[in-house]
């Protein structure tokens, strides 16, 4: 079958089965075209509970599918590709978190959503890049242990100087490879372009940005801006998506190495096979995880809304 034929079959089957397809913005364009909703982690989290359907296929990382299941416990949830993980989500385990909590006993524990559901059971609240500042500001505690991404944590800390932060030495393996020199080279090659960056990048990179925001924030800024050229400082598929949606504008990656292969493992055939009952992985979580991580995630939705 051609790509178009596979897409048509997916659209037909998901309608027949009352299935909603959610896709993270880092997925390929051909996947976004069959999705009912595309966006960043926060958008996917909210949509998971809002969608009126009997089941959800998540095209993204495992923690996204688990979050979807926790927010929609009565729906069947599948991860389109069972090996789609997130390296950052695996950087800190429960034992490591407990050691950190012992070092910072009077700190509120704020977990980036890119963490395992098990880890979330012992955190006070989780956040996404688009909601982190707002949620941390609303917390009663003045001391915050931010895990696992120190880059996002430092960005939040700069916005909230009235609070004290402690960090874990984690981070996104892709975003942290971007350097100030990469930005300088990109600006030299495209002097008229605005630089839009994700806060998972290092401070030296974020400091040079014309705009700092989540994946969705970057896309919305670029679409609405009257400017015509942009250097994109996040996963390179966003360059592809923006160029597709805004053909009258020009988009350039800040660095060629900003490609997340973990998010690229999901294919149209994965979705097709999942709908056929021949692929994917249905998400099942123990009751203690559903309950414990649920408190953390529901508080995110409450404070972030």
What residue spans do the PLM features occupy?
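Active-site loop-to-helix "anion-binding N-cap" substructures in soluble metabolic enzymes
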Residues: 1-232, 238-305
């Amino acid at each position: 079958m051609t790509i178009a034929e596979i897409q048509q079959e997916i659209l037909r089957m998901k309608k027949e089965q009352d299935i909603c397809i959610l896709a993270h913005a880092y997925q390929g364009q051909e996947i976004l075209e069959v999705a009912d909703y595309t966006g960043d982690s926060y958008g996917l989290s909210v949509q998971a509970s809002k969608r009126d359907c009997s089941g959800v296929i998540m095209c993204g990382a495992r923690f996204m599918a688990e979050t979807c299941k926790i927010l929609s416990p009565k729906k069947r949830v599948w991860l389109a590709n069972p090996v789609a993980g997130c390296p950052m989500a695996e950087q800190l385990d429960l034992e490591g978190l407990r050691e950190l909590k012992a070092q910072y006993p009077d700190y509120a524990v704020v977990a980036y959503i890119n963490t395992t559901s098990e880890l979330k059971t012992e955190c006070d609240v989780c956040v996404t890049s688009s909601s982190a500042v707002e949620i941390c500001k609303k917390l009663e505690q003045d001391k915050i242990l931010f895990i696992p991404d120190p880059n996002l944590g430092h960005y939040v800390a700069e916005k909230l100087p009235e609070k004290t932060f402690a960090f874990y030495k984690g981070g996104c393996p892709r975003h942290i490879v971007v350097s100030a020199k990469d930005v300088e080279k990109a600006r030299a090659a495209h002097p008229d372009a605005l630089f839009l960056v994700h806060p998972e990048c290092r401070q030296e990179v974020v400091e040079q940005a014309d705009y700092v925001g989540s994946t969705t924030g970057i896309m919305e800024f670029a679409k609405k801006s009257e400017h015509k050229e942009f250097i994109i400082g996040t996963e390179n598929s966003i360059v592809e998506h923006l160029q597709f949606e805004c053909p009258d504008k020009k988009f350039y990656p800040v660095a060629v190495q900003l490609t997340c292969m973990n998010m690229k493992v999901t294919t149209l055939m994965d979705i097709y096979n999942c709908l056929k009952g021949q692929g994917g992985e249905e998400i099942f979580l123990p009751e203690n995880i559903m309950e414990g991580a649920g408190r953390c995630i529901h508080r995110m939705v409450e404070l972030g809304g």
